[in-house]
């Protein structure tokens, strides 16, 4: 096994992470400290504060409105993160921000605030890839060594394996992301956006009794989700469909919103399990790490766990404080890069809406 090029810190290091690529605004402070016994570096989450922009049922979130929310809340969220961590801005060794991918205007809010704080307090800046942040926080929390990563969120669906200091994308969505698919269907059937559309679909799917037929779109290690979204939406116009207020126990041959939530989950998650298993077979991996907001879904974890156990492996996942977009994952990835000497001059801190996971040089791993 190759030795990591990342040296143990000689003193405690602190990083502030700012995340705002979509409707979650998060700020967190993390510390990396030398172990008194000479063991692995001690990593401690000092604060992890988040504020979510929530729209009315049936509505998504527009970039301009989301950016307005972030501008309104970013100072309050940073102040709370600093207060909870019990540190001062001058104590920070670096400020990390989400460089991309994500929605342009919300990303710019986080980058602008990071630049301002950097200039005010003379603190180095580190731009972080959003997906790499998810992966590094997932690895840290779960202590998983070298798993296949399934990254599932509102804007991304990727199957990833690490090789030669890159997170290589083995498969991905060919059209829309799984989180986008779930969110859009939730809007069609009138589910609330609080706490999230995907969570509400998961809750209602547990009451589903009927698995309706939906297209199954896998190709190699890629998936296509636009067709399945169109098909499940079409069921809401079927004469057998009954909306929430029309569902009763008398009629038998009906299709309910519960059935459609159940069917959409079962079919799309089966597709995700299939492409993940294919990637595992390709690289000889046994373990899976699920990251991203959809990774909180317990049914997805259960289905993936069945597959992994049959292969003699395990599934790793985190709770909602870490799988949903947050600032601490940006702080973690940023501090790893900082420890390798990777910082950004001010003129290089522009945001990149389409920032590929495999574009990042993962210098801190062997």
From Swiss-Prot:
Gene Ontology biological process terms, A to Z: positive regulation of transcription by RNA polymerase II; telomere maintenance via recombination; tRNA threonylcarbamoyladenosine modification
Entry GO terms, CC: chromatin; cytoplasm; EKC/KEOPS complex; nucleus
Pfam families referenced in this protein's UniProt entry, alphabetically: TsaD
Record InterPro entries: ATPase_NBD (IPR043129), Gcp-like_dom (IPR000905), KAE1/TsaD (IPR017861), Kae1_archaea_euk (IPR034680), Peptidase_M22_CS (IPR017860)
Gene Ontology MF term list: chromatin DNA binding; metal ion binding; N(6)-L-threonylcarbamoyladenine synthase activity; nucleotidase activity
PROSITE patterns per the UniProt record, alphabetical: GLYCOPROTEASE (PS01016)
Reaction(s) the record says it catalyses: L-threonylcarbamoyladenylate + adenosine(37) in tRNA = N(6)-L-threonylcarbamoyladenosine(37) in tRNA + AMP + H(+)
First-tier enzyme category under EC: transferase
Entry annotated with the keyword Disulfide bond: no
Binding site for a divalent metal cation: 130, 134, 151, 325
Binding-site residues for substrate, renumbered to this chain: 151-155, 183, 198, 202, 297
EC assignment: 2.3.1.234
Cofactors, names only: a divalent metal cation
Matches recorded under Gene3D superfamilies: 3.30.420.40
Free-text cofactor note: Binds 1 divalent metal cation per subunit.
Main location, first listed in the record: cytoplasm
Function: Component of the EKC/KEOPS complex that is required for the formation of a threonylcarbamoyl group on adenosine at position 37 (t(6)A37) in tRNAs that read codons beginning with adenine. The complex is probably involved in the transfer of the threonylcarbamoyl moiety of threonylcarbamoyl-AMP (TC-AMP) to the N6 group of A37. KAE1 likely plays a direct catalytic role in this reaction, but requires other protein(s) of the complex to fulfill this activity. The EKC/KEOPS complex also promotes both telomere uncapping and telomere elongation.
Homology family: Belongs to the KAE1 / TsaD family.
Subunit (UniProt): Component of the EKC/KEOPS complex composed of at least BUD32, CGI121, GON7, KAE1 and PCC1; the whole complex dimerizes.
Protein name, as recorded: tRNA N6-adenosine threonylcarbamoyltransferase
Organism of provenance: Cryptococcus neoformans var. neoformans serotype D (strain JEC21 / ATCC MYA-565) (Filobasidiella neoformans)
